[in-house]
Design a protein with these regions (language model features):
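Short, basic-rich loop-to-helix N-cap that marks the start of a DNA-contacting helix
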Residues: 1-3
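Alpha-helical linker/hinge and terminal dimerization helices associated
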Residues: 5, 41-42, 63-71
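Hydrophobic residues on short alpha-helical segments
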Residues: 5-12, 57, 64
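Short helix-boundary/capping micro-motifs
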Residues: 9-27
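Core residues of bacterial helix-turn-helix
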Residues: 23-24, 35, 42, 63
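A structural signal for alpha-helical segments
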Residues: 26, 55-58
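A short LG(V/I)-centered, amphipathic sequence patch enriched
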Residues: 39-56
Length: 71
């Protein structure tokens, strides 16, 4: 769960899966899978993947605010 939080936050900061994956030294598909796992756990998408750069969904905004509080 901790890695998922770290990965979601990196994608949020970079607004890009590719840039976040490079920053984290992992493959983009692995990062995408971890974010999908986090989304499954909360039951909702975190990112709107139809926009460039990525934007947060309403649930994603709440998730990121929660992460910021615990970091």
């Amino acid at each position: 769960m901790l890695n998922e939080i770290k990965y979601v936050y990196a994608v949020y900061q970079e607004r890009s899966f590719t840039k976040a994956a490079k920053k984290l030294f992992i493959s983009q598909p692995a990062l995408s899978n971890m974010v999908k796992k986090a989304e499954q756990e909360i039951g909702s998408p975190i990112f709107d993947r139809s926009t460039v750069p990525l934007t947060l969904t309403r649930e994603g905004e709440f998730y990121i605010q929660t992460i910021k509080k615990i970091m």
